């Protein structure tokens, strides 16, 4: 066999093997979108919980959602009512939340019949709701356990069964409002001017700048 041909074959085979190894070692980049979607479906036990306090204004009743001492839930509370103050805890780093009354400590949950009920223990998936911001700037709250079922109230403020709700219905539309007298941040403070002492270098710089002026 011709030595040149043998050398060419050897080099070709060597390059071919290197190409195969490179194809095996190269991995596809991680799909971050899929990771977020999967993690949003489970309770996040590691991240720090974000806690917010606000009222839920019902579009249909014109009143606010409240959780009473007897665990009943309705949308008949006036602005600033003690039972209308809600504590909202994030369940994942997505938009899933748990809602409980600040006065009673009961969580808003949904049973298998689609009825809103109050529970002292809100760890179940039936007490988790997904916040959906709609095009009209209202927010819909879909139950995490019963997909397609929403928190809803009638014009009289009575809870409506989740099995009879749809996202486009006015009964499922809410607006977040801060309780009366609740401030998100501290009052603005006036600016304080500090007397910064000049050192030798700053004095020299100031004098040189003054000498350069016409």
UniProtKB/Swiss-Prot annotation:
Keywords recorded for this protein, A-Z: Developmental protein, Differentiation, Glycoprotein, Growth factor, Mitogen, Secreted, Signal
Pfam families per UniProt: FGF
Signal peptide (UniProt feature, chain positions): 1-22
InterPro entries, per the entry: Fibroblast_GF_fam, IL1/FGF
Glycosylation sites per record: 31, 137, 207
MF annotations from Gene Ontology: growth factor activity; type 1 fibroblast growth factor receptor binding; type 2 fibroblast growth factor receptor binding
Keyword Magnesium belongs to the record: no
GO CC annotations on file: cytoplasm; extracellular space
SUPFAM superfamilies per record: Cytokine
Record GO biological process: dorsal/ventral pattern formation; embryonic pattern specification; epithelial-mesenchymal cell signaling; fibroblast growth factor receptor signaling pathway; limb bud formation; limb development; neurogenesis; positive regulation of cell division
Subcellular location: Secreted
Domain of life (superkingdom): Eukaryota
Transmembrane portions of the chain: none
PANTHER family in the cross-refs: FIBROBLAST GROWTH FACTOR (PTHR11486)
Function description: Plays an important role in the regulation of embryonic development, cell proliferation, cell differentiation and cell migration. Involved in initiation, outgrowth and patterning of the limbs.
Family to which the UniProt record says this protein belongs: Belongs to the heparin-binding growth factors family.
Name of the molecule in the record: Fibroblast growth factor 8
Lineage: Eukaryota, Metazoa, Chordata, Craniata, Vertebrata
Name of the coding gene: FGF8
């Amino acid at each position: 066999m011709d030595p040149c041909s043998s050398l060419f074959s050897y080099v070709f085979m060597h390059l071919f093997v290197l190409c195969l190894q490179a194809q095996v070692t190269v991995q596809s980049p991680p799909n971050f979108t899929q990771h977020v979607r999967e993690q949003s479906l489970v309770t996040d036990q590691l991240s720090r919980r974000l806690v917010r306090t606000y009222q839920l204004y019902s579009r249909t009743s014109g009143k606010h959602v409240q959780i009473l001492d007897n665990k009943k839930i309705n949308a008949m509370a006036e602005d600033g009512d003690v039972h209308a103050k809600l504590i909202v805890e994030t369940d994942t780093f997505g938009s899933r939340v748990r809602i409980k009354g600040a006065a009673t400590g009961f969580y808003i949950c949904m049973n298998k019949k689609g009825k809103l009920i109050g529970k002292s223990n809100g760890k179940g998936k039936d007490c988790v709701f997904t916040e959906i911001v709609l095009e009209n700037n209202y927010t819909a709250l879909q139950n995490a356990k019963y997909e397609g079922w929403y928190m809803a109230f009638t014009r009289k403020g009575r809870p409506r069964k989740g099995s009879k709700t749809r996202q486009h219905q006015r009964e499922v539309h809410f607006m977040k409002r801060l309780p009366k007298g609740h401030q998100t941040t501290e009052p603005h403070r006036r600016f304080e001017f500090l007397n910064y002492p000049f050192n030798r270098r700053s004095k020299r710089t100031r004098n040189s700048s003054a000498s350069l002026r016409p």
